[in-house]
Structure formats: C-alpha cells, structure tokens
Amino acid sequence: DRLAAGARALKRRAPEFPVRARCVVQRQNFADLPNAVATAHQLGLDQLSFLAADVSSSAFNRPLPWDAERVAEVALSRDEVSAFEEIVERLIVESAADFASGFIAESPEKLRRLPRYYRAINGDGDYPETICNAPWVSTVVEADGTVRPCFFHGALGNLHEQPLESILNSADAIDFRRRLDVRRDPICRKCVCTLQLGARAAAP
C-alpha cells in the first residue's frame, strides 16, 4: 500500500516524471513474474526491470559473503530453475506487447539469462556471458565516501581522503581497469548487475 501511495503521489506531482521499478527475482517470488508485471501496470509505473539475486559477493553492506545455507534460502534449486524457465518463456509470449514497448526493460533474451544464472549456481552450466563496461563509464560512491569501480569490486579510495578525480585516475585505478577482463574475472562472471553504457572510452 505504501509503495502504491508513493507511486501515485509522484505521478500527481510530476506526471511526466518516469517511475521505474526493479524486481529482484529469488526463491520467494520467481513464480510471481506475471503478477509483478500486472501490479506494475496497476501502480501506473513506467517500466519494470528484473534482476537475479546476488548471492556470491560481499556487496550491499555484507561484511562477509553468504554461507551455503543462506544462499540456499535465496537462490533457486534445480527443480525451481526448471519451473522458472517455463515461467519466463510463458511471460515472453503472454507479455509480448510489454517487451515490444519497453515496459519490461529486459529483452526476452536478456530475461532468459536469469534462469541460466541460477542453473550455474547449481553447477549446471556456465554463467551467462558478462558484457559490461561499468568500471570505465561509472563509479560507485558509498555513504562513508568509499569509491568503488562498481558495486562488487574492491575500494579504490575514499572521498574524505582524496578528490574523486584523483582516485579514478590514480595508478592503482588505471592498472585495475587495464587488467580487468570482465569475461574471465571471477567476480564479473557471477555479476547480476552489469552495465553496458555507450561506447567504451579509449582511455584506460
């Protein structure tokens, strides 16, 4: 109810302002993808995006990566992945207009990456290929001033100690970007939140 009230309030105040939502798909809600799309329409949202749950990193304020028990609470089992694949294929057919209009942010092929990701967690196949240039076109600044090349990789510095420009152009930061191969890096290969923005700059 609070989410619906907030979305309505935004639309009343600025009807032209786009209101987008992201649904993290995990064990408790993977069967509800069609309901998520219907609810997004009911709320008057402009777009809905789906994302797999990150179960392998120490990002998002986790002091340590999750243990196997915690991962199993969130990630899909083998049987659930099979059911999820069917749900995704059905959604692609039944919500074709939402894919075509961009209301569902992901393309059908990109949405199919989600069950592939959970299959890989269960040891059944490879993770979807990573295509990402986040460390070259963006940065993450945390509440305490920590600067990271993305949500998942280690810190490059802190705004309370150096200006952002100095951090991003430091020898360590340049070397990190120069050496990073997103298709082979173990952190990148399991990433659920890739970014591909514009043409990658020539600078390291």
Listing of model-derived features with the role each one plays in the protein:
Residues 1-148, 154-159:
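Radical SAM enzyme [4Fe-4S]-AdoMet core and its adjacent flexible, acidic
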Residues 124-133, 140-204:
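Flexible mid-to-C-terminal extensions adjoining Fe-S/redox cofactors in radical SAM and related proteins
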